[in-house]
Amino acid sequence: MQLALICENPERQNELDELAQRWGLSHDENSIFALVLTDTQLELRKLDEAKLGAVFVDLVSGAAAHRRKFGGGRGQAIAKAVGLKKGVMPRVLDGTAGLGRDAFVLASLGCTVQMVERHPVVAALLDDGLARAKQDPEIGGWITERLSLLHASSQDALVKLLEDPDFIAPDVVYLDPMYPHKKKSALVKKEMRVFQTLVGADNDADSLFAPAMALATKRVVVKRPDYAEFLANAKPSTAIETKKNRFDVYVKAAMT
């Protein structure tokens, strides 16, 4: 993929070069997107809409820290959806990791989560945020133990993992496909505006459902906007609703 590659600290230029090679990125000075390596982090900027600010992964402070400390623990809708309860810590595969927020919440509650992200820029941002979080004295220990990242197409990853005899199948496959926002919602979060331009909607999301159901041993959970149809038109066993979203739960077996 091509976009502007910018290093703000000359001493880190080698890091940016290695990063570009690892994720298959090449420099395009005319791109409206820039992947910028600052003194502290990797971030994405939309150059023609500077007011949107930078998009980066921060699992240590800000919103992530607030949700970890005050987000409601196991009472959160996502925790209920994956079947998290006393004595039950599901192994989760997050097939559409994005910026890792939902995976981080589940890991902070005790789940082991393997994240899958197919877009190279998003995967690079997530990998950078994960690396920084692992260095944090407060959360680094359990981040290292519980969170991992696989860069691959979600569908390919699900199928390949299903065929791998050494892979321990997850209890839960969690999917949160990018869904087109309603045109009238002008105040879409800056990240979503940047992402929808860069990544686009997951138009092939329906194709994730069958391999997800085959891979999960206990359940599949699909996060949807409240106005969205069911993934692959499959009616869930149950649904947990929040103010703006819905967690469709497809139960295969009881959580034990």
From Swiss-Prot:
Record's subcellular location: Cytoplasm
Family annotation (SUPFAM superfamilies): S-adenosyl-L-methionine-dependent methyltransferases (SSF53335)
Lineage per the UniProt record: Bacteria, Pseudomonadati, Pseudomonadota, Gammaproteobacteria, Vibrionales
Primary gene name: rsmJ
Protein name: Ribosomal RNA small subunit methyltransferase J
A GO cellular component annotation in the UniProt record: cytoplasm
Pfam families tied to this protein: SAM_MT
EC number of the protein: 2.1.1.242
Record's keyword terms, sorted: Cytoplasm, Methyltransferase, rRNA processing, S-adenosyl-L-methionine, Transferase
Catalysis performed (reactions): guanosine(1516) in 16S rRNA + S-adenosyl-L-methionine = N(2)-methylguanosine(1516) in 16S rRNA + S-adenosyl-L-homocysteine + H(+)
UniProt-annotated binding residues for S-adenosyl-L-methionine: 101-102, 117-118, 153-154, 176
Homology family: Belongs to the methyltransferase superfamily. RsmJ family.
GO MF annotation list: rRNA (guanine-N2-)-methyltransferase activity
Biological role stated in the UniProt entry: Specifically methylates the guanosine in position 1516 of 16S rRNA.
Tree of life domain: Bacteria
